[in-house]
UniProtKB/Swiss-Prot annotation, chain A:
The active site is at D158 (proton acceptor). It catalyses: L-seryl-[protein] + ATP = O-phospho-L-seryl-[protein] + ADP + H(+); L-threonyl-[protein] + ATP = O-phospho-L-threonyl-[protein] + ADP + H(+); [DNA-directed RNA polymerase] + ATP = phospho-[DNA-directed RNA polymerase] + ADP + H(+). One of its GO terms (cellular component) is CKM complex. It comes from Aspergillus oryzae (strain ATCC 42149 / RIB 40) (Yellow koji mold). Its EC number is 2.7.11.22, 2.7.11.23. It is found in: Nucleus. Residues 26-355 form the Protein kinase domain. It holds the Pfam family Pkinase. SMART domains: S_TKc. Keywords: Activator, ATP-binding, Kinase, Magnesium, Metal-binding, Nucleotide-binding, Nucleus, Repressor, Serine/threonine-protein kinase, Transcription, Transcription regulation, Transferase. This is Serine/threonine-protein kinase SSN3. The lineage of its organism: Eukaryota, Fungi, Dikarya, Ascomycota, Pezizomycotina. Component of the srb8-11 complex, a regulatory module of the Mediator complex. Its cofactor is Mg(2+). Its main location: nucleus.
Swiss-Prot record, chain B:
This is RNA polymerase II holoenzyme cyclin-like subunit. It comes from Aspergillus oryzae (strain ATCC 42149 / RIB 40) (Yellow koji mold). Component of the srb8-11 complex. The srb8-11 complex is a regulatory module of the Mediator complex which is itself involved in regulation of basal and activated RNA polymerase II-dependent transcription. The srb8-11 complex may be involved in the transcriptional repression of a subset of genes regulated by Mediator. It may inhibit the association of the Mediator complex with RNA polymerase II to form the holoenzyme complex. The srb8-11 complex phosphorylates the C-terminal domain (CTD) of the largest subunit of RNA polymerase II. Disulfide bonds: none annotated. It is found in: Nucleus.
Length: 413, 301
């Protein structure tokens, strides 16, 4: 029963030798991506263990030439703990975690695609819209995974196309829980600590306005942005991030706010009563004042944006399976609701007419789709999982926005 | 109670029966009889009192939340279901559990600061090199299979406060009963909501003027044994003369709820025996025995 205690390699209880070795269990076939926290590799199971895996290695800090134990980052700890706890068809599946050679290896099921790659594919060689039923299935699965996270008291806080994984059989898996956290933790927790969250293009207006109180609504804003991007193949609010100054105070994200206002109109206290007490309210007022009257739309222009998006994408403007139609617009406008207290919840969104009307939704988002997406790019330039401890700056595959977002993420740890 | 406790790793992997815990401990003893006779240690609960006092010291200057201390205590318990204490440096385990729990409970502390603080208190047991703590963190996480999220009874307590219209005194007392239960094996034996209900019953039934049991354990233990058990025994007997209305309300709620009354009674008994054994606690004694063990086995190296 207690055989594990007899491991002869194990020194005293507090010393550490891994009982399991990554290379004994997995064959590393190549390198996928390198982010702020480490690298992701593609691997195959060994010794009869079937399947493909993605192994995320958290790099150990280096002190001089020797790698030392320096304590794990809070982000790694959160991701490890949350992934061990969660279990849902629309959340990335963790196989195991191996602690070896002073590094952490999180072994996930391998997913062939992600939304960033899928969106990118639809812009090549020329723009061709993602079929409406596929958008609907993606969004439904995404919201379904998000509902599970929220009912498990988990805020994701970094939803963006690169973090939404898609399996070869068309299942959506929410990935990258590196910024996720539990929100029932009482008292100060959601106010203090990390200041900047969510890649700027997907960042909810209340966060831009300086709120430090995260609620599940921040994730639903991001879902709205992703919905819009699936339809238009471009980030809907593509702002430029204002960098943190030397005093590490978080600047007002003026440009990002402007991008939102250009489409959504100026937020007023009528539509968003809480806005007057937001820390950056005066910044918003001076932003509004700095432009000629009428420069910013008074009211939302989202419907106009949506209609021209349908037109450009060749979606039918009326209704039917070939278009997200009027229901799609209504859902989008409820996701991109300024006031976080009025914004639609994951539960409500799943019951929206966009999903209720228009027939069954496939659990395979590729169902009925003729085209083929390319496989995830796996390179050979670094597939030594043991030595690759320095973070690469280069990302294989597609250009990505995530490095930009993570740069500020690093600062807050 | 949290909807997700039922699916949690805590429920699936970290709930033991009393027998299983006893088996584990017996197997440790079997495997290293020499160490056990050479290095006798105080009763596990007395050691736990000692550990928790060390944690409180560590947390003092770092404005740590109670919940982080509670999580650290659970980590220590889980770790010692996988490792014989006599093969470890408990001071390092306590410090590491604290460091890890602070990160998990969203009040992170820098590793250098934690090590410096620990060296203030136990310079002879904690090396200045932070990598020791980093390594122990790996051991802790690995033994716990990265299952680091701990559900605590505090949350159930605050959820039940309005429902049972508990006074702030009652809540404070229940809170301190919950603090005390970390000194026993209870966190490994029962789900958090059972503990919370037990704490509420103890608080409502005894309503003592003191806000904490510490130091006054013996009279309380007596009172709980004599009075509390009777009341608990009367829970099933709804037609009897019955206790005062305040308590009747609680009894009524309990009957409605699906809480396992037997489990609640067992928890109360564990607590009573904790307060009894507390009488024998001596910090000096724990310190001496642990110190001798760590030093003569070179566990601090
Ligand atoms: N399970 C998986 N299967 C295949 N590829 C994956 C998997 N998980 C992650 N990836 C790829 O690796 C990239 C980075 O993973 P992830 O977002 O988890 O790490 P990160 O260090 O937080 O990265 P970033 O800083 O870029 O967000 C993803 O965008 C995706 O391309
Ligand atoms: Mg990512």
């Amino acid at each position: 029963m207690l055989k594990e205690h007899l491991d002869p390699r194990k020194p005293s209880g507090t010393g550490y030798t891994s009982k399991v070795r990554v290379r004994d269990k997995y064959h590393i076939v190549g390198f996928i991506s390198s982010g702020t926290y480490g690298r992701v590799y593609k691997a195959l199971g060994k010794n009869g263990q079937k399947g493909e895996f993605a192994i995320k290695k958290f790099k150990p800090d280096k002190e001089g030439e020797i790698i030392q134990y320096t304590g794990l980052s809070q982000s790694a700890i959160r991701e490890m703990a949350l992934c061990s706890e969660l279990d849902h068809a629309n959340v990335v599946q963790l196989e195991e975690i191996i602690l070896e050679d002073k590094a952490i290896f999180m072994v996930f099921e391998y997913t062939e695609h992600d939304l960033l790659q899928i969106i990118h594919h639809h812009t090549q060689p020329h723009r061709h819209a993602i079929p409406a039923p596929m958008v609907r299935s993606i969004l439904f699965q995404l919201l379904n995974g998000l509902l599970y996270l929220h009912t498990s008291w988990v805020l994701h806080r970094d939803l963006k196309p690169a973090n939404i994984l898609v399996t070869s059989s068309g299942a959506i898996r929410i990935g990258d829980l590196g910024l996720a956290r539990l929100f029932y933790k009482p008292l100060n927790s959601l106010f203090s600590g990390d200041k900047v969250v969510v890649t700027i293009w997907y960042r909810a207006p209340e966060l831009l306005m300086g709120s430090r109180h995260y609620t599940p609504a921040v994730d639903l804003w991001a879902v709205g942005c992703i919905f819009a991007e699936l339809l238009s193949l471009r980030p809907i609010f593509k702002g430029e991030e204002a960098k943190m100054d030397s005093k590490k105070t978080v600047p007002f994200q003026r440009n990002q706010m402007m991008k939102i206002i250009e489409i959504m109109g100026l937020p007023t206290k009528d539509i968003w009563p809480g806005i007057v007490s937001m820390p950056e309210y005066s910044q918003l007022q001076s932003l509004a004042m700095s432009r000629a009257p009428g420069h910013f739309p008074r009211s939302s222009n989202l419907e106009g944006w949506y209609q021209s998006c349908l037109k450009n994408g060749g979606y039918a403007t009326s209704s039917g399976a070939g278009t997200p139609g009027a229901d799609g617009y209504d859902l989008l406008s409820r996701l991109l609701e300024y006031d976080p207290t009025k914004r639609i919840t994951a539960q409500e969104a799943l019951e929206h007419p966009y999903f209720k009307n228009g027939g069954p939704i496939s659990a395979n988002c590729f169902e009925g789709f003729e085209g083929k997406y390319p496989h995830r790019r796996v390179t050979q330039d670094d597939n030594d999982i043991r030595s690759g401890s320095l973070p690469g700056t280069k990302r294989s595959g597609l250009p990505d926005d995530s490095l930009m977002g993570r740069a500020s993420k690093r600062l807050k740890e | 109670m949290a909807a997700n406790y039922w699916a949690s790793t805590q429920r699936r992997h970290w709930l033991f029966t009393k027998e299983r815990l006893a088996d584990i401990r017996e197997s440790f003893r079997e495997r290293d009889k020499a160490a056990h006779s050479q290095f006798p240690l105080p009763d596990q609960r007395l050691l736990n009192i000692y550990f928790s006092q060390q944690l409180i010291k560590l947390g003092k200057r770092m404005s740590t939340r109670q919940q982080a201390l509670a999580t650290a205590q659970v980590y220590i318990k889980r770790f010692y279901t996988k490792n014989e204490i006599r093969h470890t440096n408990p001071y390092l385990v306590v410090t590491t559990a604290f460091y890890l729990a602070c990160k998990m409970e969203e009040c992170p502390q820098h590793i250098r600061f934690v090590v410096a603080e620990a060296r203030n208190f136990w310079p002879e047991f904690i090396a200045p090199d932070v990598s020791k703590l980093g390594e122990c963190e790996f051991a802790l996480i690995s033994e716990m299979n990265s299952q680091l999220i701990v559900h605590h009874p505090y949350r159930t307590l605050s959820e039940l406060q309005p429902e049972l219209s508990l006074t702030s005194d009652e809540v404070a007392l229940a809170w301190s009963v919950i603090n005390d239960h970390y000194l026993t094996d209870l966190p490994l034996l029962y789900p958090p909501h059972v503990i919370a209900v037990m704490a509420i019953i103890v608080a409502v039934v005894f309503k003592p003027s003191q806000t904490s049991f510490h130091g006054t354990a013996a009279p309380l233990a007596g009172a709980m044994r004599d009075g509390g058990m009777n009341i608990l025994a009367a829970l099933g007997d709804k037609n009897g003369a019955g206790p005062p209305p305040r308590i009747q309300k609680l009894v009524g709620w309990l009957a409605e709820s699906e809480v396992d009354i037997r489990a609640v009674i067992e928890c109360t008994q564990e607590l009573v025996s904790l307060y009894e054994i507390w009488e024998n606690y001596s910090e000096k004694h724990c310190k001496e025995l642990l110190g001798r063990m760590v030093k003569s086995k070179n566990l601090d190296k």
